[in-house]
């Protein structure tokens, strides 16, 4: 219940504007300005109790307390490492970022790309902090985390060994913004070791709030050059790299002066007239300096002598940048990563802005964790979303009528769980064309038969998923306006009037009731429990742990028209009729004859009983009524249906104008919640 309330509160806060870069959420409820002011007034340096200078902040395995790698580690402030520490000297540059004893080169490549865009860097590294007059041993950074920006406060105690920084450091040794940024990112993810291993796209997204794509250039699509130009026109960040095949390959320099395993930035793409034909060129920047491409189209190559003067004016390169032909680029580089930025990140009006939609959801065993296509009987249970694209792209180089969009799917908080033995799941998505009969409809969750008979139109990379629990964030970026929303069943119920009056009860049932009810001719919840459990105990075709007193109270509350907390003859007959109907549905949907229902079978049984429910409601029902092995026995099935029917009937009774909403004061809400 607390988790559901927290989710609702978070959604409302985001809708109110919290979680933007300008109004970031205070991570761990720590307020940078307040904490700094407190330290300055007290004359002390900040020590962060939420990410202490202690072994648990380093790691859990290779950087764990008993690892040789962490022996002799001391946490020191920059002032203890050099006489004149600086936060940023002369602007953030590539030489500020040197890798230490941590496998987070993916993160460093993303940080290096930040240095190429001052506006983006300023969103991650807020101004107004350093080692000057207001120094108090406290710094803060901002990261995008699954749909919201968080402001992360740290102290400046950094792990060192033999007097040197253990992890990221600057080449000069007196500049500390990159080391402090890495520490803040480690805090968000639980510890330093949690940062080991990853992709630059993850860093791109966390530093920009954008959506990242990755292309293997040996399998580049035929329109790769157009994709690059379109990305540059939209102000995207583009990074490229050459894969390494062994540890010895790392930082190896090719014959034409390209460095393997390092991240480059792609900053331009043009076509020039060259010897009577069009030549495609790309401009690449080496954030690591030192070496630069010496092949065709490099700075002093002869190819430039055959380019029109007008074209040459439009083809410029700054220091550290070089041009190469697009074909050479595809041949030498292994991977291209594109991060499309959100409109609020782009300050230059010349860039084309994309339209964005974001949804947070989850996979839960038994309800919405349907797994991959290898699980055809549950695949349909996965969360579904419908995307409607109405406007054609503005693309003069493309004669096809089409609408471009990018889908990004990220799983939440998995790095933080590494400390407890968890890791990333393999996840993915598939895109299907909406059947014509469902055009214009949104409240439709496509069923198993659809996915058994229709092929996907596009998908993410192949993945194997065993239907694990997890939380995710789905985003859709499109060039033109689009509509994206969950594709879910509406909440509705067909509640049949099964009321049996006293006069309609036959003599046989009347005699049975007289025997069961006793002198007062009424059945209490406790008596109902005894009756129901005697009946189900005789059946071998259904499994049950027996009806609980709580379930029997729900039954009585639903059937008790008089309000005395007991069932009379007609009320008991109505209940019995209802239970018999539920038993028929239960048996019908127990497809394997096991005596229990699986959670997918329960979903179909609920529909047959007259209830259509959203994924979120199914998650709650499975969490409440399923056994540990994700099966539903008969008593839990009846309990679920009884509570659902009672809640629907109460709501409909209060919603007199059938508006779909009701208003309750706190006392009324408590009254109904405690039924």
Residue ranges of each PLM-predicted region?
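Structured alpha-helical subdomains that flank or immediately precede key functional sites
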Residues: 1-544, 549-554, 561, 569-573, ...
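Acidic carboxylate motifs that coordinate Ca2+ or other divalent cations, activating on Asp/Glu
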Residues: 520, 562-564, 592-594, 629, ...
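Strongly charged, low-complexity linkers/loops
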Residues: 617-628, 640
């Amino acid at each position: 219940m607390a988790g559901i309330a927290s989710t609702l509160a978070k959604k409302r806060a985001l809708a109110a504007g919290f979680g933007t870069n300008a109004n970031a959420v205070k991570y761990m409820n720590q307020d940078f300005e307040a904490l700094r002011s407190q330290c300055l007034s007290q004359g002390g340096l900040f020590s962060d109790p939420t990410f202490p200078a202690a072994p648990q902040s380093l790691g859990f395995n290779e950087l764990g307390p008993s690892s040789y790698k962490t022996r002799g580690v001391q946490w020191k402030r920059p002032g203890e490492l050099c006489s004149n520490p600086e936060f940023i000297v002369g602007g953030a540059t590539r030489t500020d970022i040197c890798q230490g004893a941590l496998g987070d080169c993916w993160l460093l490549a993303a940080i290096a790309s930040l240095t190429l865009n001052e506006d983006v860097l300023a969103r991650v590294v807020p101004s107004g902090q350093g080692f000057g007059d207001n120094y108090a041993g406290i710094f803060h950074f901002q990261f995008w985390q699954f749909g919201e920006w968080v402001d992360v406060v740290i102290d400046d105690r950094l792990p060192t060994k033999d007097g040197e920084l253990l992890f990221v450091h600057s080449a000069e040794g007196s500049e500390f913004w990159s080391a402090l940024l890495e520490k803040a990112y480690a805090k968000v993810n639980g510890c330093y070791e949690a940062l080991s291993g990853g992709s630059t796209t993850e860093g791109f997204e966390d530093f920009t709030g954008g959506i990242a794509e990755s292309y293997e250039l040996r399998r580049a699509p035929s329109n790769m050059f157009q994709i690059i130009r379109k990305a540059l026109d939209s102000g995207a960040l583009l990074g490229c790299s050459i894969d390494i095949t062994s540890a010895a390959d790392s930082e190896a320099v090719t014959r034409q002066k390209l460095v393997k395993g390092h991240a480059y930035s792609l900053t331009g793409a043009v076509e020039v007239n060259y010897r009577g034909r069009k030549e495609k060129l790309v401009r690449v920047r080496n954030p690591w300096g030192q070496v630069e491409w010496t092949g065709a189209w490099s700075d002093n190559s002869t190819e430039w002598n055959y380019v029109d003067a007008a074209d040459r004016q439009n083809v410029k390169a700054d220091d550290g940048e070089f041009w190469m032909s697009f074909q050479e680029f595809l041949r030498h580089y292994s991977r291209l990563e594109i991060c499309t930025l959100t409109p609020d990140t782009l300050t230059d009006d010349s860039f084309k802005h994309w339209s964005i939609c974001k949804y947070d959801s989850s996979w839960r065993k038994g309800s919405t964790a349907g797994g991959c296509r290898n699980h055809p009987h549950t695949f349909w249970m996965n969360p579904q979303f419908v995307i409607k694209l109405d406007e054609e792209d503005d693309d003069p180089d493309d004669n096809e009528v089409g609408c471009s969009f990018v889908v990004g799917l990220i799983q939440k908080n998995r790095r933080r769980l590494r400390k407890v033995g968890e890791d990333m799941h393999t996840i993915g998505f598939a895109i299907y064309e909406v059947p014509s009969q469902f055009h214009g409809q949104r409240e439709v969750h496509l069923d198993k038969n659809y996915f058994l008979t229709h092929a996907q139109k596009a998908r993410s990379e192949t993945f194997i998923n065993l239907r694990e629990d997890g939380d995710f964030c789905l985003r859709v970026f499109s060039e033109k306006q689009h509509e994206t929303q969950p594709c879910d069943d509406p909440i509705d119920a067909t509640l049949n009037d099964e009321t049996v009056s006293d006069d309609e009860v036959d003599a046989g049932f009347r005699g049975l009731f007289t025997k069961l009810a006793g002198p007062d001719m009424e059945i209490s919840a406790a008596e109902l429990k005894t009756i129901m459990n005697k009946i189900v105990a005789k059946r071998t075709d259904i499994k049950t742990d027996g009806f609980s007193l709580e379930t029997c109270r729900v039954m009585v509350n639903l059937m008790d028209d008089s309000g005395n907390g007991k069932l009379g003859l007609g009320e008991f007959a109505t209940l019995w009729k209802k239970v018999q109907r539920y038993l028929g549905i239960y048996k019908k949907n127990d497809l394997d004859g096991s005596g229990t229902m699986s959670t997918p079978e329960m979903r179909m049984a609920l529909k047959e009983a007259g209830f259509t429910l959203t994924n979120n409601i199914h998650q709650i029902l499975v969490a409440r009524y399923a056994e540990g092995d994700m099966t539903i026995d008969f008593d839990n099935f009846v309990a679920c249906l009884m509570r659902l029917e009672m809640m629907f009937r109460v709501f409909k009774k209060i919603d007199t104008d059938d508006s779909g909403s009701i208003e309750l004061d706190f006392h009324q809400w408590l009254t109904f919640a405690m039924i």
